[in-house]
Amino acid sequence: MVRESIPKEGENIKIQSYKHDGKIHRVWSETTILKGTDHVVIGGNDHTLVTESDGRTWITREPAIVYFHSEYWFNVICMFREDGIYYYCNLSSPFVCDEEALKYIDYDLDIKVYPNGKYHLLDEDEYEQHMNQMNYPHDIDIILRRNVDILQQWIEQKKGPFAPDFIKVWKERYKKIRQY
């Protein structure tokens, strides 16, 4: 990753999700950077405009903290709802950043984590379909399945973005930055 492309704290950036075939999948119009390093980007957003590949748009319903890592094949969205914190985890390529946006390839598989800690692997049918349509290499399949296991371990061990302190720290940081 180019040093100049690492987003800085307080900066607002776009997030662009692509599919394996290089086509845009989804764009979040604005996320405020809370931490940006070579390996980790943490951001926050609330009521953010999201544009789908077909041009449809919608607005996120609640504040969220997003977590991206340059070495893991997943990213995590921590959503703050009235009944607790939900996590939506995308199996994806590690992120890259350039002047335009933070970017990653979405590989269909998702894990949804509920406030009680239970979780479900989602979209396995979509993954199989796209793996065949877009010819995901066998190596990618192995990497993604290994990262599903890593992600499940993190969830069960309350590690990384699933740690209670992670939520407290970054939610507070996001509130402070938004006040300025």
UniProtKB/Swiss-Prot annotation:
Record's keyword annotation contains Metal-binding: yes
Effect seen on changing residue 123 to A: Loss of activity
Positions of transmembrane segments: none
Effect seen on changing residue 126 to A: Strong decrease in activity
Effect of residue 108 to A: Loss of activity
Cofactor(s) annotated in UniProt: Mg(2+); Mn(2+); Co(2+)
UniProt-annotated binding residues for Mg(2+) 1: 90, 106, 110
Taxonomic superkingdom: Bacteria
Binding-site residues, GTP: 25-26, 45, 88
Effect of residue 58 to A: Decreases catalytic efficiency with GDP and ADP as substrate
Active site: 26 (proton donor)
Residues given in the record as Mg(2+) 2 binding sites: 108, 110, 123, 126
Catalyses which reaction(s): a ribonucleoside 5'-triphosphate + H2O = a ribonucleoside 5'-diphosphate + phosphate + H(+); a ribonucleoside 5'-diphosphate + H2O = a ribonucleoside 5'-phosphate + phosphate + H(+); GTP + H2O = GDP + phosphate + H(+); ATP + H2O = ADP + phosphate + H(+)
EC number: 3.6.1.15, 3.6.1.6
Alphabetical list of InterPro entries matching this protein: DUF402, FomD-like_sf, Ntdp-like, SA1684
Cofactor binding description: Activity is highest with Mn(2+), followed by Co(2+) and Mg(2+), but the enzyme probably uses Mg(2+) under physiological conditions. Has low activity with Ca(2+). Cannot use Cu(2+) or Zn(2+) ions.
Primary role: Has nucleoside phosphatase activity towards nucleoside triphosphates and nucleoside diphosphates. Can hydrolyze GTP, ATP, GDP and ADP. GTP is the most preferred substrate, with the highest substrate affinity and catalytic efficiency.
HAMAP family: Ntdp
Family: Belongs to the Ntdp family.
Protein name, entry field: Nucleoside triphosphate/diphosphate phosphatase
